[in-house]
Amino acid sequence: MSKPKQKQKARRMLVQALYSWDVGGTDLVNIESEFHSDNDMSKVDVTLFHNILYGVPKNLAEIDGTYEPFLDRENKQLDPVSRAVLRLSSYEMLYTIDVPYKVVINEGVNLAKTYGPTDAYKFINGVLDKVAIEKRAVEVAANRRA
């Protein structure tokens, strides 16, 4: 399986894992252990999965603070799937600079289409676009000039 496919699979699993952590308060070690026992992890970028699973809670205030200014409601009023997608994507915007912002947005939109409520992907797209403009300003500007 190609590296991009492994990353996509990790992101799909991360939305589910971050949802479990957010809604159920499940311990991260237990979440990671369940995913390893229930899935064929040879088809997953396990490093990405691990780093983001533990990185989101560790940096939660900064991550939530990245996208909250662009919300039209309180963060706690978001559906938990959209919140998981925004946290995952904001983490990547902040900490995985090697992933182009357009890829981060596209992956977030696709995750929202797959797991989120109807039309959540439009909301996710708008928020992540604003996050990219703020957090990846040089990359966005260079892309717009090209």
Give short role names for the model-derived ranges:
Residues 1-114, 118-146:
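N-terminal interaction/assembly modules
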